[in-house]
Structure formats: structure tokens, C-alpha cells
Amino acid sequence: MTITESEEIFKSIKNADGIIIRWPKKKEEKRAVLEYLITKFEKGKRYSELEVNMILKRWHSFGDHSLLRRELYDNFLIDRTPDCHEYWVHEE
């Protein structure tokens, strides 16, 4: 995806403050949102579920941080412990 394509996607998804205002329907738009959100996490740091939720709540306004957390995990952008108590940015 080029920078221009990414900018076009975000025109209707993100407000001027960088807050995601809606969850997109198209797969490539969802991926762009997830890649944007993962930049809000520090690599190498471990986060509690509460911390992950707080970060996601800060960067979206449509009220479904659980969806975003699941999507980040399902798309291999974050990893977690089996008991879901700790999360971290997936590193390849």
C-alpha cells in the first residue's frame, strides 16, 4: 500500500487528532487501521490487558476496544500469554 492509498483510507476512518472513528468493512482498510494502532505500543514492553485496553480506548472513538485487541492478536500484531494477562508487540 502506498502512502497516498493509506492517506485516502484514513480520510474517512481517522479524525484530525488521529483517532479512529469507525471500524472499516474492507480487509485492506482494517489492516491499515491495525498497523496504525500497533505503532501506539512500544516494542519489547509487556502490557497488562488493562493497559492494552487503555491505549486502544485512547486511539478510537467507536467504543469497541475488545474488537481491536482481538483483531491485533488474530492478525499476529500482538502476542499474549495463554491466560491473557500479558500482551506485547509481535516480533518476527
Regions found by a protein language model. Name each.
Residues 1-5:
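N-terminal regulatory modules of eukaryotic gene-expression and nucleic-acid-associated proteins
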Residues 74-83:
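A short, conserved structural fragment
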Residues 73-74, 89:
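Beta-rich nucleic-acid/ligand-interaction surfaces
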Residues 43-56:
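Short acidic, hydrophobic short linear motifs in intrinsically disordered regions
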Residues 84-92:
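Short, cationic-aromatic polyanion-contact patches
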Residues 59-71:
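Short amphipathic alpha-helical interaction segments
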Residues 35-38, 53-57:
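Amphipathic alpha-helical segments within well-ordered protein domains
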Residues 7-43:
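Short alpha-helical segments that sit at the start of domains
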